[in-house]
Amino acid sequence: MEDIVIVAAARTAVGKFGGSLAKTAAPELGAAVIKNLLERTKLSADQVGEVILGQVLTAGSGQNPARQTTIKSGLAKETPALTINAVCGSGLKAVMLAAQSIAYGDSEIVIAGGQENMSASPHVLLGSRDGQRMGDWKMIDSMIVDGLWDVYNQYHMGITAENVAKAHGITREMQDALALASQQKAAAAQDAGKFVDEIVPFSIAQKKGDPIVFSADEFINRKSNAEALAGLRPAFDKAGGVTAGNASGINDGAAAVMVMTAKKAAALGLTPLGRIASFATSGLDPAMMGMGPVPASQKALARAGWKAQDLDLLEINEAFAAQACAVNNAMGWDTSKVNVNGGAIAIGHPIGASGCRILVTLLHEMQRRNAKKGIASLCIGGGMGVALTIER
C-alpha cells in the first residue's frame, strides 16, 4: 500500500458552553476550517474528492451536516460528504475512513475531521407526535442522551469514570493533580503562542458594531489551583472523586485535516506533516469505557511495529482525569510526553471534533519538536477506543 499522509491540519479555537460559538451552527465552524485547509495547500475547491466529518449531536441540524459543511465551504457540489457518529472518537475515525478511502482508490484527496456545537443541541419532547393525554410530560436533553449517557447501564459518562477510578486505584488527589497540570500546560502553551498556527480565526457577526474574531481557546481556566480543585464537590457519586474541575468540558468547535498519498503530495508540491503509520479501533465493557485508549493504542502500536517507549509525543484525550490517569498507568508510557500543551480538561471536548482536534495539535507540536513518532487516542462512550499513529 502507498504511504498515506496528512498535508494540512487546522481547527477553530474551542468555545465554552454557551460561549462565543454558541449561536454558530456546527457546519459553519467546519466550513471555516475547510476553507483554511484550501488556503494552506493552495488547492482549488474542485480538487477535493470527498469530505468525512464526525458530528455526534445532530438533532435538528438538518440533513447530513458534513454535506452542509461541504457546500458552505465552497467545495464543488460534486464532492460527496459523509457524517459519522463514533461519539468522542468521531473526528479521528473520520481520518481513518479517509485513509481507507484513499487506499482503495475511492478518492485521491479527502478532508476529514469533526465539528460540534454542544451549546446548540436541543431539548426534545419524545412522543409529541401522538400527544400525552394524562400525567407529566418530560423533555429530554439531547446533548446528554445522545452524547454523554451510557445507554447500556443507564447512567452518565461520569459514572464510568468513577468505575475506572475504583478499579484502578485512582484517588481524588491523583485526578486533581492531572487536571491542574492540564490547565497549567494549556495556559502556558496559549501564552507562548503555540496554538496560533493550528487555529483558524473565526469571525462572529454582532448585532451592532464590527464582527468579533474568535481565535483563542476560551475554556482554559487560568484561576485553577490545587485548593480550588480540592474544594469542589463530587459530581456523580458523593463518595467519588470526579468533579467539574477534573472532567473535560462541554464545548463547541471544529477540526480537520487534508489526507492524500505521499505520491500525490509530491506531485502537488506539498510537504507532509506526517505519515499515517497505523490506526485501530477497539471495544470493551461500556461501564469501563474510559480505558478504551489502552486496547486501541496497543493494536495501533503493534500494527506500526512500535512500542509505547518509541513514542516521542502523545495526545491522549482527557475525557476525565480518572481515566486519563488509569490509561497512563496501564500503558506505561512517558507521561512527560503526554498532552504537553494541555488536554481536554483545559482546552475542552467538543465531542464530534475532539478526535481530530488532538490530531491537529499533535501534528503541529511534532513539527515544532521535530518529533518522529506520535500517537493520538481517545476513549469512546459506549465502550470503545480509537488510536492513530503518525510518523515523520
Where are these regions (language model features)?
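Condensing-enzyme catalytic core mediating Claisen C-C bond formation in acyl metabolism
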Residues: 1-24, 36, 226-291, 295, ...
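Conserved active-site "lid/cap" helical segment
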Residues: 1-61, 65-73, 80, 160-172, ...
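Active-site-proximal alpha-helical scaffold in enzymes
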Residues: 84-116, 159, 165-194, 256-263, ...
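Beta-strand segments within the central parallel beta-sheet cores of soluble alpha/beta enzyme folds
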Residues: 46-54, 80-85, 110-115, 174-181, ...
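Conserved catalytic cysteine-centered active-site region
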Residues: 55-109, 152-156, 223-249, 330-357, ...
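Flexible glycine-/small-residue-enriched beta->alpha junction loops
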Residues: 109-163
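N-terminal extracellular/periplasmic Venus flytrap/periplasmic-binding protein-like
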Residues: 11-12, 22-32, 40, 174-267, ...
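Active-site pocket-lining segment
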Residues: 159-162, 195-198, 206-207, 277-346
